């Protein structure tokens, strides 16, 4: 079983619960589909956990909040911008380096892992209607 974790956004409790559930279900592959940070109170802790899993063979993908947290330009709403500004001050150098190193996409066997669009992994389109939601099915960042 593959455990797909997306949009944790610095939420320690959510990450802990998701990882515990994946372990209970005996996941043999872990994929973090982006947005490890942003909004939540524990961006460093969440990033450290992802780093531990990646060191053991997990995949981690860059999300738009991760990119913004390490200074890559991306237009965000004022609330997200404030959260990212706060997050930047909480991340240590090694955590920032890890986030900076994350790829936009990883292809593995018959799967493509991305945070947003498989057609344009470097663009993060917001899901604003049912049509876009349909196109975004089974990827992170969709928040559907």
Feature roles, as predicted:
Residues 1-56, 142:
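N-terminal active-site segment of His-dependent metallophosphoesterases
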Residues 46-114, 119-140:
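Active-site neighborhood of divalent metal-dependent phosphoester bond hydrolases
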């Amino acid at each position: 079983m593959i455990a797909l974790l997306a949009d944790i956004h610095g939420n320690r409790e959510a990450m802990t619960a998701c990882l515990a559930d994946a372990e209970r279900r005996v996941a043999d592959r872990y994929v973090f589909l982006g947005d490890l940070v942003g909004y939540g109170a524990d961006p460093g802790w969440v990033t450290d956990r992802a780093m531990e899993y990646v060191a053991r063979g997990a995949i981690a993908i860059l999300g738009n909040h991760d990119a913004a947290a390490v200074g890559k330009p991306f237009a965000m709403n004022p609330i997200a911008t404030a959260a990212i500004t706060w997050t930047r001050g909480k991340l240590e150098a090694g955590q920032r380096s890890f986030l900076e190193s994350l790829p936009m996409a990883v292809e593995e066997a018959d799967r493509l892992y991305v945070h947003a669009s498989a057609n344009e992994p470097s663009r993060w389109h917001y899901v604003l209607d049912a049509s876009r939601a349909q196109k975004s099915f089974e990827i992170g960042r969709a928040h559907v």
